C-alpha cells in the first residue's frame, strides 16, 4: 500500500541495510519460492514471516518516531500552542499505530495484546476507560517519562539497537531530500 510505503521510506536511511532493503529482498525470495512450489515451501514461509515482522517493525519504528516528537515538543521550556497541538497530533498518530496491532490475530505478531494494552495505558489511552492524553500537555514533567517507557519496551520487543532508536527520530525522506 502506498501510504505504508511512505512510512517505510521515512524510517529507512537508504543505506542498503534498512527496512526497505529487507522487505525487497524477502519479497523477491517469496516470489521465487512460490514459482518453485512445493520445492521451496520452507523458503516461502521464511520470507513471508520476515516480511510480516519487518512491517511490524516499521510500525513500531513509526510509534517510536512519534513518541520522540512528543517528548521533544513538550520538553521545551515554553512550548507554543502550535507545539502543543503538534505534540497531541503526534501522540494520536502513535496511539493509532499502536492500537492497530490489536487488529492482528494473537500469535501473528511479536507484540502481545498485554504489551499493546500496557503501552496504550502509558499513552493515557487505555483500551477500556477514559483517555487522558491532555495530561502530556498539562503535566509533561510527570507524563513524558511514560513515552520513554513505551520506546524502551518497543526497543526490547523488536530488538532495536540504540542507534536505530536514535535514527527513528528522523524522517529520512526529509533528511535526505528524497
Model regions and ranges:
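Mature extracytoplasmic or organellar-lumen-exposed domains after removal of signal/transit peptides
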Residues: 1-178
